[in-house]
Design a protein with these regions (language model features):
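Hydrophobic positions on the alpha1 helix immediately C-terminal to the Walker A/P-loop
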Residues: 14, 18
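Hydrophobic anchor at the beta1->P-loop junction of P-loop NTPases
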Residues: 3
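Phosphate-binding/switch loop-helix module in NTP-utilizing enzymes
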Residues: 66-120, 124
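Conserved lysine of the Walker
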Residues: 11
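N-terminal phosphate/diphosphate-binding loop that engages ATP/GTP or pyrophosphate donors
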Residues: 20-75
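The conserved Walker
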Residues: 7
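Conserved beta-strand scaffold positions in the cores of enzyme catalytic domains, especially
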Residues: 28-30, 105, 155-159
Length: 168
């Protein structure tokens, strides 16, 4: 199952609710993405391993590193991404989930994690492994990795909106 929606509509909150409802019946592995805000603006993102709770800052407007991805608006400061952090949390947690979990949680497939070739490869492996997955993704992103996920016949996509997020 994929949960899509615009930024801020509650995709992460929705998958965490689902995970909490089923975690006593199924082992869950993977990661979640959490924005870091300062004065209402997103200045970075933490990635968190769902199983271990390990969390690491993986993107920040304060880092002058490559790769850099654009902010939400043309005026926004681009985010510098630490691929080592992406690989340590996102890639490793999904790889471990392929081996050990009943359900693979990937929150979120987007510009942050898709900059990592290692993550893209392990996500493709996860999609082929036959285990159920719970994925969040931006509704309109043209990212090639997201486009390939959207085209899958074996994936059901639900859209989170400001109106339905409270009931999902």
């Amino acid at each position: 199952v994929a949960i899509s929606g615009q930024p801020g509509t509650g995709k992460t909150r929705t998958v965490l609710r689902i995970a909490k409802m089923i975690e006593d019946k199924f082992s869950i592995g993977g990661f979640t993405t959490h924005p870091i805000r300062e004065e209402g603006e997103i200045i970075g993102y933490n990635l968190k391993d769902y199983t271990t709770g390990e969390e690491e800052l993986s993107a920040s407007v304060r880092w002058d590193v490559k790769p850099r991805v654009p902010g939400k608006t043309p005026e926004s400061t681009p985010l510098g991404i630490r691929l080592d952090a992406v690989n340590r949390i996102a890639t490793e947690s999904v790889a471990k989930a392929i081996e050990e979990a009943d359900l693979i949680l990937v929150d979120e497939v987007g510009k942050l994690v898709s900059e990592s070739k290692e993550f893209s490869a392990i996500l493709k492996e996860a999609l082929k492994c036959g285990k159920p997955m719970l994925i969040t993704m931006h509704k309109r992103s043209r990212n090639p990795l997201l486009q390939s996920i959207r085209k899958r016949d074996d994936l059901r996509t639900l859209e989170v909106t400001p109106i339905n997020s409270a009931i999902l």
